[in-house]
């Protein structure tokens, strides 16, 4: 196995971080790795993948994969390559989450992918309440070892499947139904006067739901395709995007994964100097 393709969907950066770390680890073992971010705007004609191993990474939304992930998989044609499906969640592999990959795996198999490996990676929670420093330091300090384990499983082409609790099939089904209302979150975002029209929210919107004329520094306009990844709200440098529908699901103090990572690196450096 020489060639590996990693596709990932990310909102606030957790899945992207996992994808980049895993890619670096696999490259260090002399594998050819292509990394691609999933945007709804890039889902066009059917794409046939020619790779030795395929890895799909996504955050858990409502106990399932985000809608654009399903749309992405449905536009792919596999070559029966061995495949890993990796979900990312603040709760990790707990009850309510064990069936979060089921629909994605089913769609991949239908598209001629040989799914042999399923995994869950825990990252700091971004829903309702962001973790405190002690909590996210504990989570992120374990990430390198987890990435090493995943890389070794991929390289050795081992078959590993997760146990799924029967109640989670029902929970995931309810989560799928809940997604029908996520567009209301995007429609309900209020753009405050602090907005500079920088265009960062539109550039990074994985659902292609935000329109803005960056040259004119106009304020963003939200469509009806929001998947509630929370990326635009948390990543706005001016904190100028204020949710009105479902606002309780956003931590008013913000969520900054880069800052968390820097703090963890600083703690590690301090320990090494002791």
Regions found by a protein language model. Name each.
Residues 169-199, 203-206:
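A mid-sequence, solvent-exposed acidic-amphipathic segment
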Residues 2-4, 12-18, 25-38, 48-58, ...:
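FMN-binding flavodoxin-like domain, especially the glycine-rich phosphate-binding loop
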Residues 2, 31-32, 185-187, 218:
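Generic structural motif recognizing short loop/turn segments at the entrances and edges of beta-strands
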């Amino acid at each position: 196995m020489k060639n590996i393709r990693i596709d990932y969907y990310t909102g606030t950066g957790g899945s992207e971080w996992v994808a980049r770390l895993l890619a670096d680890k696999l490259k260090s073992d002399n594998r050819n790795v292509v990394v691609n971010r999933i945007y709804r705007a890039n889902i066009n004609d059917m794409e046939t993948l020619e790779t030795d191993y395929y890895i799909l990474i996504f955050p858990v939304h409502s106990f399932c994969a985000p809608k654009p992930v399903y749309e992405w998989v449905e536009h792919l044609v596999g070559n029966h390559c061995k495949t890993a499906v990796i979900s990312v969640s603040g709760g990790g592999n707990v009850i309510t989450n064990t069936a979060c990959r089921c629909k994605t795996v089913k769609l991949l198999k239908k598209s001629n992918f040989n799914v042999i490996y399923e995994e869950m990676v825990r990252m700091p929670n971004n829903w309702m309440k962001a973790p405190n420093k002690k909590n996210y330091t504990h989570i992120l300090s374990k990430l390198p070892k987890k990435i090493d384990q995943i890389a070794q499983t991929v390289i050795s082409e081992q078959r590993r499947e997760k146990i799924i609790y029967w109640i989670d099939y029902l929970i995931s089904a309810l989560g799928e139904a809940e997604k029908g209302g996520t567009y209301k979150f995007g429609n309900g975002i209020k753009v405050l006067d602090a907005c500079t029209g920088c265009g960062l929210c539109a550039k990074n919107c994985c659902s292609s739901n935000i329109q803005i004329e960056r040259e004119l520094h106009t304020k963003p306009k939200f469509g009806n395709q929001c998947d509630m990844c929370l990326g635009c709200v948390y990543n706005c440098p001016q904190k100028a995007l204020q949710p009105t529908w479902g606002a309780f699901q956003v931590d008013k103090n913000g969520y900054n994964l880069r800052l968390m990572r820097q703090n963890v690196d600083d703690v590690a450096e301090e320990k090494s100097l002791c």
